[in-house]
Regions:
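N-terminal transmembrane-helix/juxtamembrane module of multi-pass inner/ER membrane proteins
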Residues: 11-58, 92-121, 207
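Membrane-interface elements of multi-pass transporters and channels
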Residues: 38, 42, 69-73, 97-106, ...
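Loop-to-helix transition at the N-terminal end of transmembrane alpha-helices
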Residues: 49-52, 76-85, 176-179
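Interfacial segments of alpha-helical transmembrane regions
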Residues: 63-91, 150
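Alpha-helical membrane-inserting segments
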Residues: 63-66, 86, 90-95, 99, ...
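Membrane-embedded catalytic cores of phosphoryl/pyrophosphoryl-handling enzymes
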Residues: 112-207
Length: 207
């Protein structure tokens, strides 16, 4: 689609690009309104709880610290911290300011929630989702003895991402982009940590 749009004169390309962005935004807002139709006091409490767990990647950072402190899968604990750091650098510092997408409640004030403090930063990608999927990806790549922890981590990441939609602080495409970014950061962090561990082992072997 992008190649087709690029073949048009610049003015038409900009117009078509703007139409595509508007279509995506309208679809995002429609999905958010549909999700709002499922709201209930019980879900309010549940979603606020999960979105709080994902704040600043706190849940995953605590898990990483516990892995490092216990000595079990220590390198993967460091990988989780590295993955979250990559999300901060590329997502929060880089892409959010590059894309500069407004929050959905700024485009449609009827979506503004009173359940949490409304964030003032840009919307895309979702940092909660990115850090959660980054950590979950690391755990999926780790040789954990308790394999059930892997689907639990992925499920938790999905719920945290959905909580951002339920609270209408992100668009669906923000959350999708955040998940993709998180997976990429998780894979990259594991690769980096494994390379470092391999280099340290080789150095010890040569000593």
């Amino acid at each position: 689609v992008c190649q087709i749009v690029a073949k048009f004169p610049p003015s038409i390309s900009r117009m078509l690009g703007g139409m595509m962005i508007e279509m995506i935004q309208n679809a995002d807002l429609s999905i958010l309104h549909a999700i709002q139709g499922t709201a209930s006091p019980a879900l309010d409490t549940f979603m606020v709880g999960f979105t709080t767990l994902g704040e600043f990647g706190a849940l995953w950072a605590l898990l990483a610290v516990s892995m490092i402190a216990s000595g079990k899968h220590r390198s993967y604990g460091f990988a989780i911290l590295a993955a979250i750091a990559l999300v901060v650098v590329f997502g929060e510092i880089g892409l959010k300011h590059l894309i500069a997408r407004p929050r959905p409640f700024l485009l449609d004030p009827s979506l503004a929630t009173t359940l949490i403090d409304l964030p003032s930063s840009y919307s895309c990608p979702s940092g909660h989702t990115a850090s959660s999927f980054a950590a979950a990806t690391v755990l999926c790549l780790a040789p954990l003895a308790h394999r059930w922890l892997k689907p639990v981590a992925v499920g938790t990441a999905c719920i945290i991402g959905f909580s951002r939609l339920y609270l209408c602080v992100h668009n669906p495409t923000d959350v999708l982009f955040g998940a993709v970014l998180g997976i990429a950061c998780g894979v990259a962090a594991v690769a980096i940590v494994r390379k470092i561990a391999e280099a340290l082992q080789n150095r010890k072997a040569q000593a």
